[in-house]
Amino acid sequence: MKILLPYSTHFEVVKTDSSAKGKVITGGIEKFCKDLEDNIDGIIPVAITKQDKENRQTKRVIRDAIALHDPDMILFNNPWWSNMMMSFNVPLICIMHEPLVRDIRMVELGIILRDLNDSGCHIHFVSPDQLEFHRNMAKRIKDVQFGAIKGFINPSFLPDDMPYSSDLIYDVSTVGRCDNEKAPFLIHQKLRNSSDLNSLVMTNDGVYKSSTVNDYVQDNQHWTEPRHTMRGLPHSEVIEHISRSKVFCSTWPKESWGITAMEALGCGVPTILMTGDNDIHASEIVAASRSHYFKINRKCSGDEFETTVREFAITMKNRRDEIAEMTREKHSLSKWKSCIDKVIDMRYSDKNKSRSDLTEFFT
């Protein structure tokens, strides 16, 4: 079976030299594509470069790939490509990674998903919180009901060689694309008056279309020890540094799922989830136990955040083995691969026109 996987990124990726220990993964969507390419038989990746987009060649690149490979289906995770994808007359799977945000892009999303559903495309979300958010938004903004989805897909898994460390350097770390919404430097800002806690931000220096986001990149070049910052690291090094943290923090309440939260827990690192006023974070579904994470409002004071980091690290110090073991079992490669294979097989046979039991597959 041949599955075409077109993908793109939205900014220039920081380059690494040949001595780098691995590929730079700029975000969860990019990691999902790489995981598919590395682990699922029949995946044919089609990279849409920045130059392709600037030259308006996206459709041509994908059309040429279809002519070359004659795929059985197309799997894509950019719903704004929907009209183009439907024009190819190839069976479609759409993975909805979109976060829980309200911006101008989302105004038409309900209509897009409805039209995809009507066309026979199989749509999968990554978490129930994400589905509920987008259902409610589509109804409120456009009075649209986009219909039943096929189920939920975990966007990633934990490999067998996840690092585990007892040599802990950082009191708290985070990973995030360098933009003002994700706000990875929030942990530095919260701890700016603390002299004895080491915080680590791992991010990128992307070049974005938005001047606001580019300003955020430039405004956070000044941090110095004990506010550590590492940019453009290969994914393998990111995971190593996470494993050497006493606590990990997810700074964005609007995550659709939370791959880095899963990776942190898989390294045995207890995780702080920053929430909005609704006290909800989609990454709660990732943890193997409610005791493995702690929720705190993103608007908390620096003192409150510092106290949380200190106390949660002490409380969970002797449970890191448990956190790692339980999370790795819940998010094993074999379980993830089994679900992806089932998604592909279901699309290939196209026998089930209603919501499948994938809804319960990852509970």
Predicted regions and their residues:
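Short alpha-helical donor nucleotide-sugar binding micro-motif in glycosyltransferases
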Residues: I239-S245
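Conserved donor-binding/catalytic core segment of Leloir-type glycosyltransferases
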Residues: P163-K182, H188-L200
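A short, active-site helix/loop in glycosyltransferases that binds the activated sugar's phosphate group
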Residues: I104-F146
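Short hydrophobic beta-strand element within catalytic cores of glycosyltransferases
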Residues: P270-I280
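A charged, aromatic-enriched C-terminal amphipathic alpha-helix characteristic of glycosyltransferases
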Residues: G28-K31, L36, K299-E304, I314-T363
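Active-site proximal beta-strand in glycosyltransferases
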Residues: M73-N78, M85-M106, H122-F125
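Nucleotide-activated donor-binding/catalytic signature segment of Leloir-type glycosyltransferases, i.e.
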Residues: T212-L233, I239
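Aromatic "clamp/platform" in nucleotide-sugar-dependent glycosyltransferases that forms part
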Residues: P253
